[in-house]
Amino acid sequence: MALPAHLQETFSPEEVQFLVEEETVKIFPRITTRQKRRDKNRGAYGDVDTKWSMLTTENDNLNNMVAMRSTEVKLWIALLLKQQNKCSIVAPSWLTLRELNRKIQQETNNSDRFCDLPWNWLVIANVLFAKAADDFHDPVHELRSKVQDLREIRQTKVLKGLKQLNASHLQLDNLSLLEINELRPFIVRTMDKLREIHDSANTDGGVVDGDEEEI
């Protein structure tokens, strides 16, 4: 079955989030999944190899967690544990008021390039705001505002960059997946039209040259 035209050119929001949820994040688990057994000779408990899995997964960290000891798991697992109140999610280092203000300043001071941000920064921010708002040290409403400011500044720079668009390429380094996904349909159609104009101009030029030679 053929996909709708708009899904042939871009990822759907669900597809974008699915890709991003495969990224690793740090958590503080509130449960212990590491198993122990009693040493009959010494009367003590020792760590042993896991005989079962919390989930059907190869994620060793997931099956070796100790309560309140930080570990790293896939984002989708962290969200599942968070939903069950079994962990706290540690916000990325760039997702603080201090760092966002610094990124905004960099974007403002450099009109010809974008500051370095993770490829998934917008999706990560929105997911954590929605699912783990209580895990942030900074007020979430202020973080949302800064993320929106940063996004709008970058969108303005993108529009300025489109003035440099030609039939061969457009260089927009450091854009995130979501930003590129939003721009792609417009850019693809515009570049296709520019190629048509370019090819048409070359063809017309060739015909004119031929007529001049015959004359």
From Swiss-Prot:
Entry-linked PANTHER family: DNA REPLICATION COMPLEX GINS PROTEIN PSF2
Name of the gene: PSF2
Cited InterPro entries: GINS_A, GINS_bundle-like_dom_sf, GINS_Psf2, PSF2_N
Upper taxonomic lineage: Eukaryota, Fungi, Dikarya, Ascomycota, Saccharomycotina
Protein source organism: Candida glabrata (strain ATCC 2001 / BCRC 20586 / JCM 3761 / NBRC 0622 / NRRL Y-65 / CBS 138)
Cellular compartments annotated: Nucleus
Subunit annotation: Component of the GINS complex which is a heterotetramer of SLD5, PSF1, PSF2 and PSF3.
Name of protein: DNA replication complex GINS protein PSF2
One GO biological process term: nuclear DNA replication
Chief localization: nucleus
Superkingdom in the source lineage: Eukaryota
Family, similarity comment: Belongs to the GINS2/PSF2 family.
Pfam families linked: PSF2_N, Sld5
UniProt keyword list: Chromosome partition, DNA replication, Nucleus
A GO CC term assigned to this protein in UniProt: CMG complex
SUPFAM superfamilies hit by this protein: GINS helical bundle-like, PriA/YqbF domain
Keyword Acetylation: no
Function: The GINS complex plays an essential role in the initiation of DNA replication. Has a role in chromosome segregation.
